[in-house]
Amino acid sequence: MAALVRISSLCHRGVSPLLFRPSSLIRPLAVQQKDHDCSYLISARIHATPSNYAGSGSKAATMHWTGERILSIALLSLAPVAYFCPSPAVDYSLAAALTLHGHWGLGQVVTDYVHGDAKIKMANAGLFVLSTVTFAGLCYFNYHDVGICKAVALLWSK
């Protein structure tokens, strides 16, 4: 049976503690079952789809994940459309898509890094305020100024 040996077990630097003795640092690469003669490699299961994470069986998480992916693809397709055909409809579509994309992304940051009921409620309220102000600002910019498409074109032209 093959074995994986750490480098620290090969280098002896004087006295080593009990937990770091060479005999405790040798770990088997393959695990052998007592009932069978064949050995099985240790493997990790990698989940690539959101359906493996939906523990309650509801479709809300899957639909949300699908919506995020559709929005990401829509943003990818809006970039060339905004460059070749700038119009108010594309400006407002970009404003809505960018705001929603940012809202969902920052919502995941809040979910991952904010702990405690009161802190989560405050962070979500702040996120809603930020998303609302962002969308209102982009709509104001589209209505009273040149719009998102022409503004980016002006940045590239200078």
From Swiss-Prot:
Q: How does this protein sit in the membrane?
A: Multi-pass membrane protein
Chief location category: mitochondrion
List the transmembrane segments. 63-84, 90-110, 120-141
Please tell me where a ubiquinone binds in this chain.
Y113
Question: Where does it live in the cell?
Answer: Mitochondrion inner membrane
Membrane side Mitochondrial matrix: which residues?
Answer: 30-62, 111-119
Q: Binding residues for heme b, per the UniProt record?
A: H101
Q: Which residues lie on this side of the membrane: Mitochondrial intermembrane?
A: 85-89, 142-158
Q: Does the keyword Hydrolase apply?
A: no
Question: Where does the transit peptide lie?
Answer: 1-29
Q: What GO molecular-function term can you cite, just one? A: heme binding
Q: Does the keyword Signal apply?
A: no
Any single biological process term in GO: mitochondrial electron transport, succinate to ubiquinone
Which keywords does this Swiss-Prot/TrEMBL entry list? Electron transport, Heme, Iron, Membrane, Metal-binding, Mitochondrion, Mitochondrion inner membrane, Transit peptide, Transmembrane, Transmembrane helix, Transport, Tricarboxylic acid cycle
Record's GO cellular component terms: mitochondrial inner membrane; respiratory chain complex II (succinate dehydrogenase)
Known pathway: Carbohydrate metabolism; tricarboxylic acid cycle
InterPro entries with a match to the protein in the record: CybS, SQR/QFR_C/D
Q: Which residues form a coiled coil?
A: none
Protein role: Membrane-anchoring subunit of succinate dehydrogenase (SDH) that is involved in complex II of the mitochondrial electron transport chain and is responsible for transferring electrons from succinate to ubiquinone (coenzyme Q). SDH also oxidizes malate to the non-canonical enol form of oxaloacetate, enol-oxaloacetate. Enol-oxaloacetate, which is a potent inhibitor of the succinate dehydrogenase activity, is further isomerized into keto-oxaloacetate.
Family, as annotated: Belongs to the CybS family.
Q: How does it assemble?
A: Component of complex II composed of four subunits: the flavoprotein (FP) SDHA, iron-sulfur protein (IP) SDHB, and a cytochrome b560 composed of SDHC and SDHD.
Record-given protein name? Succinate dehydrogenase [ubiquinone] cytochrome b small subunit B, mitochondrial
UniProt source species: Danio rerio (Zebrafish)
Q: What is the lineage of its organism?
A: Eukaryota, Metazoa, Chordata, Craniata, Vertebrata
